């Protein structure tokens, strides 16, 4: 028998920015297969990730990423990347994402995410994709929204995710695990 401990995670919303109306896609994640970085191929986008991993995807996997501008990940530039107003759709379509810290960050900074179908599946959210074709369709769907519609979707998802914003509850859960 294996004991599995569910370690809770936590995100504190500090920016609470209004929705960004740019239709450019932003990607702030490692270049892991389950993060689906190949969805960016042919998409007007920015990627904030590791340069060497990016090169591998271009040279070994054959993706061009000709419409993607790469920014070398450095933690000190994280706020600057998310705070940009020239991208407003977050590539948050990560398969089997256990928590999704970067998804919370995108919401906090006013970016409307495209989610994988299995993430937060109990929340009804229309902008989900499983493959590249669906991902591209969701970019088009978001691009057609008015500012009010985008803001409403952002507010709804951000408000739902606030249940992970209670620091006292998070500390209590950790203490229960450590004291068990």
Sequence positions of predicted segments:
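Donor nucleotide-sugar binding/catalytic pocket of nucleotide-sugar-dependent glycosyltransferases
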Residues: 1-16
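Conserved donor-binding/catalytic core segment of Leloir-type glycosyltransferases
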Residues: 16-35, 44-46
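Conserved active-site histidine-acidic residue motif and adjacent donor-binding/catalytic loop
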Residues: 54, 59-83, 96-97
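Short alpha-helical segment that forms part of, or immediately flanks, the ligand-binding pocket
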Residues: 79, 101-108
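Nucleotide-sugar-dependent
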Residues: 89-103, 116-125
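Short hydrophobic beta-strand element within catalytic cores of glycosyltransferases
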Residues: 108-116
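A charged, aromatic-enriched C-terminal amphipathic alpha-helix characteristic of glycosyltransferases
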Residues: 133, 144-179
């Amino acid at each position: 028998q294996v004991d599995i401990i569910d370690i809770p995670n936590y995100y504190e919303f500090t920016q609470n920015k209004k929705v960004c109306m740019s239709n450019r896609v932003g990607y702030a994640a490692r270049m892991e297969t389950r993060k689906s970085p190949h969805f960016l191929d042919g998409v007007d986008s920015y990627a904030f990730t590791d340069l060497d991993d990016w090169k591998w995807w271009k040279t070994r996997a054959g993706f061009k990423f000709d419409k993607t501008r790469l920014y070398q990940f450095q933690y000190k530039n994280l706020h600057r990347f998310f705070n940009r107003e020239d991208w407003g759709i977050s590539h948050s379509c990560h398969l089997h994402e256990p928590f999704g810290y970067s998804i919370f960050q995108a919401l906090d900074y006013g970016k409307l995410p495209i989610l994988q179908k299995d993430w937060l599946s109990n929340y009804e959210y229309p902008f989900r994709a499983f493959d590249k074709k669906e991902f591209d369709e969701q970019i088009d769907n978001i691009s057609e929204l008015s500012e009010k519609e985008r803001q409403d979707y952002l507010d709804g998802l951000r408000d739902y995710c606030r249940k992970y914003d209670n620091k006292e509850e998070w500390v209590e859960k950790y203490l229960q695990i450590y004291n068990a």
